[in-house]
Amino acid sequence: MRLVIADCSVRYEGRLNAHLPLARRLIMLKADGSVLIHSDGGSYKPLNWMSPPATLRVREPSEELLADGVKEVWEVQAGKSDDRLVIHIMTVHSRLEHELGADPGLIKDGVEADLQRLLAEQITLLGEGFSLVRREYPTTIGPVDILARDANGATVAVELKRRGDIDGVEQLTRYLELLNRDPLLRPVRGVFAAQQIKPQARTLARDRGIECLSLDYDEMRGNVDTQSRLF
């Protein structure tokens, strides 16, 4: 495990592009090859990342980048796609490297991470003809749980909660406001998905043009006669 605190900018290049402007951030490099970019607030989730398998290459900046103050360029290449994470390092404030060893892992059941994985695998629960773009789509205010395309090719942002309340709708609203500024994505509509959705949250979502999807976790795990209700 390597932890680096640095002034940096980050660019994600792939099926969709994303950019984090210059700021002080924590860069986490794990032994499995994953790279995660964190800020000191906004969300416990990384702002951007590359999942394993991935390869990190550090190179010298070009003269143009040197003139802009870039000291190093880190390129993280995905092992199974053309996706790439490019990190421009301006100033390194701290470095820490430590071997953590094997971890037994955490067994979780029925939590949001599991719901996200299952919905990504069964993306047509959102509707006929839907396709997955990416789980944990990075934005400057935190990652969107699922980004998808509907049958017409329009972008759909999905926020997943175990229990859906007003805070979750507000969070999805902020994501939609940001994503709809991107000409490559807009128009982007939202789906608020949860095992249970409170009536107040459903009312607020409807008022903001956000669809609500009730998920049956047990049926999704078994994928037997799966029926979800889209309102």
Curated annotation (Swiss-Prot):
A Pfam family per the record: NucS_C
Cellular component GO terms, alphabetical: cytoplasm
InterPro entries (UniProt xref): Endonuclease_NucS (IPR002793), NucS_C (IPR048301), NucS_N (IPR048302), NucS_N_sf (IPR049173), tRNA_endonuc-like_dom_sf (IPR011856)
UniProt keyword annotations, A-Z: Cytoplasm, DNA-binding, Endonuclease, Hydrolase, Nuclease
Signal sequence bounds: none
Family recorded in the similarity comment: Belongs to the NucS endonuclease family.
Superkingdom, taxonomy of origin: Bacteria
Task of the protein: Cleaves both 3' and 5' ssDNA extremities of branched DNA structures.
Provenance organism: Kocuria rhizophila (strain ATCC 9341 / DSM 348 / NBRC 103217 / DC2201)
Cellular localisation: Cytoplasm
Protein name: Endonuclease NucS
CDD domains linked: NucS-like (cd22341)
GO molecular function terms noted in the UniProt entry: DNA binding; single-stranded DNA endodeoxyribonuclease activity
UniProt EC number: 3.1.-.-
Principal EC category: hydrolase
